[in-house]
């Protein structure tokens, strides 16, 4: 899919969130889209296991959805290694993988020239899930609750 022409978020991401029944693992540099936030909260309320990794760079921006997601009980870890976590990827129900240039923002939906691959393949989903959990485990658990300061190296 390509944005803004194809509306990659509303036609690609939202349907996958809405039909997920088991798990959603997201690595996203910046997430401000309210539709996605609401859909993720609905999915959590359906019992879907959701985990999100985001970067510290824009966490405190007014449109950032990190706090709303955390308040809804969705675990969000914040990576703080000076903008290092720049992925835009997600795995849904161990079957679908999104790899994209697209942050999940209004600008990515309506303004920016973006691309998004949605791959239905369990092997690729397994590899991306493994990478997600490698990153997840590398981030201290305290950053599920705190917003870290910038640093140039991994904190122990």
Where would I find each of the regions flagged by the language model?
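Secondary-structure "cap/kink" motif recognition
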Residues: 12, 16-22
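Active-site cores of enzymes that catalyze phosphoryl transfer or operate on phosphate-rich substrates
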Residues: 1-4
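PLD/PLD-like phosphodiesterase catalytic module centered on the HKD motif
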Residues: 6, 10, 23, 35-156
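Short, glycine-rich nucleotide/cofactor-binding loops
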Residues: 26-33
């Amino acid at each position: 899919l390509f944005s803004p022409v194809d509306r990659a978020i509303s036609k690609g991401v939202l349907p996958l969130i809405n039909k997920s029944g088991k798990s959603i693992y997201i690595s996203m540099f910046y997430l401000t889209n309210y539709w996605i936030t609401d859909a993720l909260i609905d999915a959590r309320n359906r019992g879907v296991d959701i985990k999100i990794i985001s970067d510290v760079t824009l966490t405190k921006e007014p449109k950032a959805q990190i706090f709303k997601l955390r308040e809804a009980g969705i675990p969000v870890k914040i990576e703080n290694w000076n903008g290092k976590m720049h992925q835009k990827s997600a795995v849904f129900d161990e079957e679908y993988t999104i790899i994209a240039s697209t942050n999940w923002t209004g600008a990515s939906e309506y303004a920016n020239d973006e691309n998004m691959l949605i791959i239905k393949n369990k092997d690729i989903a397994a590899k991306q899930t493994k990478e997600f959990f490698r990153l997840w485990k590398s981030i201290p658990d305290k950053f599920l609750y705190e917003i870290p300061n910038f640093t140039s190296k991994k904190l122990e």
